[in-house]
Amino acid sequence: VLSNAAETRATPTTPDNLKNTDFDVFAFTGDGTAFMGKVDTEFGHDGVNIVYNNGKWDYKNASDLRYWPTGALDFYAFNPGTVSEDMMMNYMWEASGTVQKISYTCIDEYGANTGHANYDVMYAMAKGQTKDMNNGIVKFNFKHILSQVVFKAKTQYDNMQVDINMIKIHNVKMGGFFTLPATADGTGSWSDPADLPSEVSGLGKFTVVKDVNITVKSNTIATDISTTTPMLNRPQELTAWKVSETATKSKLEADNAKQCYLEIACKIRQSGAYLLGSASEYKTIYVPFGDTWEQGKRHIYTLIFGGGYDDQGEAVLNPIQFDAETTGWVNAAKDVNV
């Protein structure tokens, strides 16, 4: 299903707003014959569209209505089912009786100035369903395939003040293929799209915030940076910039080694005196950043500002530390101080 409607910011889907979404459904018989949708072995936007209307989930198009056969069916659903024109190549899916995959490439939505948003992509499956189960109603439990990432900040000392203008994360995988699990209680798996162009399959950068003036002046209470504007990212393991090693001392060497770091434009003051930047100028520091982003988890990072590194790997004040947590969108299992 395609739409020209432009999104403005990623909106994580919760049980409270699920009814504002739609999804596309496929159903296959035991021998792999398509009963709803079609045997789809190429990425696209096929399937039977289901929407929430008049208090219930229903077929968007009456012509798609299907009645229960005598045998069991395996159902697969992809949410959202409506794809805006600008995201058609970023988000696609395919489904057959044996393999179901999602192709998704994230966009730098907070840095691109396009007004478009990443999708909180989800899937659901219900295998071996018959007309006698659940009064003939197929029950879907949608699961997120992406990770959610947000930031807060504190200062290292109570007499410090930090003014943040921009934060970016460098050397992050932008997308890949997600293969649905064999059973509904599985987790699925991500793989790299090696056959796609480097700008799609390679590493990129994500903007956390830009062109802002966020003041941080407490070493006990964290100041919010992006908890209401979360980034949605592909789950992955991030290897932090190894600034202490000779082979990866500089930022350029870290880029070549595919090591991850934060780029932060800020001003740092202590007792009113500028340690970094000035009243009229932000300065850029770089901070090694590593963690494992998990599927369906919300990762919360608290930056503890005391300094960082320049692009040659030389210390600027004291390096920033982290405190990290994750729960299930759910936040991921721990808070991470950075």
Regions found by a protein language model. Name each.
Residues K19, T187-S189:
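Intrinsic-disorder/low-complexity recognition with aromatic hotspots
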